[in-house]
Amino acid sequence: MPYQVTPTPLEGVLVLEPKVFGDARGYFFESFNARDFAQATGLERPFVQDNHSKSARGVLRGLHYQVQHPQGKLVRVTQGSVFDVAVDIRPQSTTYGQWFGLELKADNKKQLWIPEGLAHGFLVTSDTAEFLYKTTDYWMPEFERSLAWNDPTAGVDWPLAELAPLQPSLAAKDAAAKSWDQLRQEW
C-alpha cells in the first residue's frame, strides 16, 4: 500500500504518508493515485479541481468552507512548511466544535484529507510555502464562507510564537470573517 493512513481526533480527517523511494540521486513518490487512495482510506472521491498557492511567512488563509457544494480537500506542501488546520463545523458529527492541526512540510511529504463540511485553513511557518490541494467540488465564491481564524469558540491554537514579531497576514475576506455564532445558522 503506497499510503500509510493515520486517523486524527476529528471524524473523517486522515493523515496520509506516501511511500517515498529515495537514493543518492533524489526521490520519487506518487502524490496521488485514485485506486490507491480509495484502497487506503475506504473513500472514493471524484477530485475535480487542483489548486496551487504560494504564500510568504505569516500568511494565514482561512478558515474556509462552502455552505453549498462543500469541498473535500486533499492537501500537501511542495515547498516550505505550514500549520494546517481543520475545524469540524458539522452539527451531526461526533467531533463537532473540535479542531485538528499539524505541520505539513515539503520534507515530510504528509498529506491531510479533510472531508466535505469542515472549515480549513493554514498558517505559513517558513519563509515561503507552496501549497497544493485537490478538491471534490468546484470553488463557488457565492457559497464560500470564512470562519474567523481567531474565533474563541473554534479555539484553534495557532503557533503564533514562531512568527514573532510578525502577526498573521490576512486577505480582506479573511480579515472580515465571521464568528462561529454568526455562521452556525447556515450549518
Please describe what each predicted stretch is.
Residues M1-D107, S126-T128, T135-W187:
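Non-catalytic, conserved peripheral segments adjacent to functional cores
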Residues L112, H120-T125:
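Short beta-strand His + acidic residue motifs that chelate non-heme Fe in jelly-roll/DSBH
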